[in-house]
């Protein structure tokens, strides 16, 4: 995390179907794993059916006409026109897992209702009216193949589609001669059945390419965190399906927006057990968090400048030379009642560990102290090394990962002084006070804004729960459309 000082760079705000990355190590293990269970696919299916149903209701049925011959009446002509789909009922749609192959959309026992106009002509004999067409037992089977393009973005295509119609029944009204149409209803029903049959799979294929593929493209490949860092969520390989879940293996790596440099480590293996009680689960490795620290460190923004103006008037301590009298009297005498500036930084990488007991790290910090002269120039005083232990609590909120850090007491070491040595213990209370009241709140302000998770547009997590495991966090949650 980066700390926003007053005149150092400041912090800024940080298809669904396959929710689910290029480092020096060319790591093939993911830093972030996203899985969707059958329960999650059921949610996806219901959401997808809304759009598919709209497309099916918009089926355009062309007018058709023909000749007929009836004994004793001779030849005549008929025409069916102004046809529109009034209803397309899909009672039990499913998206099934096809191990190693992808997904399968399955629709059975659907029904369609179509209305329109008809007319008949035989010499001077004319008749016309309305008709209702009932199509029962409509089934659709479509196989969906999931892949990834060179950029690591998910792709989805409809590889095969087949539809079947059990029965078609027509009912005419509006004329006493409607019985004529009923005499050759099989011909009409067969013609309409062929028309609908040809259009169903065309619509399914078009919905996948024109609706679903653009939607899954809203799954982020690169997610901006702030003006300093982004997260690489690119797919390392095509999504994998088993009989339990669909899995996307993502790079899961923070990088400095000024330079996407390599991280000198590889992600750990995450042993994630299947759990169908939630729609999705996400394995978030320690690699993910450590690349965040590395990116901010590479950008040289892990520092904060403190001056007295930033402290409250009733603060326990004030940053001026007066409080140095007890351990650096020479400084207090040479620079009476002048301001102090503290530059607190994290020059060394501190590896974050994830264990069943939680997330922890041992930061090594530094504080450089300066006297601020009336002309704003700085006189260096001393350099302190600071060691502490820290813990990190992580939660999920909506579409972000949020956190809060807790710091242990800092232990100080005098590394350098331009005005003689002194007992650093005399400074411990001051430094710990400033860390707890000025520095830590800024860190936690950033952590509360959080980091974006790899979710498609309009989808948030609900009922989320997080577990700490060895080297990774497991996030389980349900999905909600906003």
From Swiss-Prot:
Residues 1-27 form the signal peptide. Residues 221-285 are annotated as: Central sheet, part 2. Residues 28-38 are annotated as: Central sheet, part 1. Residues 235-240 are annotated as: Cleavage sites for elastase. GO terms for biological process: defense response to bacterium; defense response to Gram-negative bacterium; immune response; innate immune response; lipopolysaccharide-mediated signaling pathway; negative regulation of interleukin-6 production; negative regulation of interleukin-8 production; negative regulation of macrophage activation. Coiled coil: none annotated. The keyword DNA repair does not apply. It holds the Pfam family LBP_BPI_CETP_C. Glycans are attached at residues 375, 389. Keywords: Antibiotic, Antimicrobial, Disulfide bond, Glycoprotein, Immunity, Innate immunity, Membrane, Secreted, Signal. One of its GO terms (cellular component) is extracellular space. It is found in: Secreted; Cytoplasmic granule membrane. Residues 463-482 are annotated as: Central sheet, part 3. One of its GO terms (molecular function) is lipopolysaccharide binding. Disulfide bonds join 161-201. Residues 286-456 are annotated as: C-terminal barrel. SMART domains: BPI1, BPI2. It comes from the Eukaryota. Residues 37-219 are annotated as: N-terminal barrel. Its main location: secreted. The cytotoxic action of BPI is limited to many species of Gram-negative bacteria; this specificity may be explained by a strong affinity of the very basic N-terminal half for the negatively charged lipopolysaccharides that are unique to the Gram-negative bacterial outer envelope. Monomer. Homodimer; disulfide-linked. Belongs to the BPI/LBP/Plunc superfamily. BPI/LBP family. The N-terminal region may be exposed to the interior of the granule, whereas the C-terminal portion may be embedded in the membrane. During phagocytosis and degranulation, proteases may be released and activated and cleave BPI at the junction of the N- and C-terminal portions of the molecule, providing controlled release of the N-terminal antibacterial fragment when bacteria are ingested. The N- and C-terminal barrels adopt an identical fold despite having only 13% of conserved residues. This is Bactericidal permeability-increasing protein. The gene is Bpi.
């Amino acid at each position: 995390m980066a700390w926003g000082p007053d005149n150092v760079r400041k912090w800024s705000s940080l298809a669904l179907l396959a929710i689910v990355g290029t480092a020096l190590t060319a790591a093939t293990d993911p830093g972030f794993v996203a899985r969707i269970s059958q329960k999650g696919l059921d949610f996806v299916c219901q959401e997808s059916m809304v759009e598919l149903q709209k497309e099916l209701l918009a089926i355009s049925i062309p007018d058709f006409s023909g000749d007929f011959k009836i004994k004793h009446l001779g030849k005549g002509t008929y025409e069916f026109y102004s046809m529109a789909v009034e209803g397309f009922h899909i009672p039990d749609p499913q998206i099934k897992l096809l191990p190693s192959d992808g997904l399968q959309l399955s629709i059975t026992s659907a029904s369609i209702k179509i209305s329109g106009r008809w007319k008949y002509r035989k010499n001077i004999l004319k008749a016309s009216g309305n008709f209702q067409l009932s199509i029962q037992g409509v089934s659709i089977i479509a196989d969906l193949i999931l892949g990834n393009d060179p950029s690591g973005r998910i792709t989805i295509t409809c590889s095969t589609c087949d539809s079947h119609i059990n029965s078609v029944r027509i009912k005419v009204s509006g004329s006493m001669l409607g019985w004529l149409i009923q005499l050759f209803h099989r011909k009409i029903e067969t013609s309409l059945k062929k028309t609908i049959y040809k259009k169903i799979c065309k619509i399914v294929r078009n919905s996948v390419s024109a609706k679903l593929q653009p939607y899954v493209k809203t799954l982020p490949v690169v997610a901006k965190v702030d003006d300093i860092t982004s997260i690489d969520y690119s797919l390392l390989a095509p999504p994998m399906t088993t009989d339990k879940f669909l899995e996307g293996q993502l790079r899961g790596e923070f990088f400095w927006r000024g330079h996407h440099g390599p991280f000198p480590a590889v992600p750990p293996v995450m042993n994630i057990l299947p759990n169908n009680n939630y729609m999705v689960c996400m394995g978030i490795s320690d690699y993910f968090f450590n690349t965040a620290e590395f990116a901010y460190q590479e950008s040289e923004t892990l520092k904060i400048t403190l001056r007295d103006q930033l402290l409250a008037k009733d603060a326990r301590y004030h940053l001026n030379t007066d409080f140095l009298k007890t351990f650096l009297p020479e400084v207090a005498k040479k620079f009476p009642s002048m301001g102090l500036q503290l530059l607190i930084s994290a020059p060394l990488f501190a590896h974050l560990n994830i264990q069943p007991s939680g997330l922890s790290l041992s930061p090594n910090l530094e504080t450089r102290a300066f006297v601020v002269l009336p002309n704003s120039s700085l006189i260096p005083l001393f350099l302190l090394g600071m060691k502490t232990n820290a813990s990190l609590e992580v939660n999920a909120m909506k579409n972000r990962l949020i956190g809060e850090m807790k710091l242990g007491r800092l232990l100080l070491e005098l590394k350098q002084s331009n005005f003689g040595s002194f007992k650093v213990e005399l400074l411990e209370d001051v430094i710990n006070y400033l860390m707890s009241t000025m520095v830590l709140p800024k860190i936690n302000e950033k952590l509360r804004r959080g980091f974006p998770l790899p979710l498609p547009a309009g989808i948030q997590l609900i009922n989320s729960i997080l577990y700490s495991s060895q080297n990774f966090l497991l996030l389980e949650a349900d999905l909600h459309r906003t």
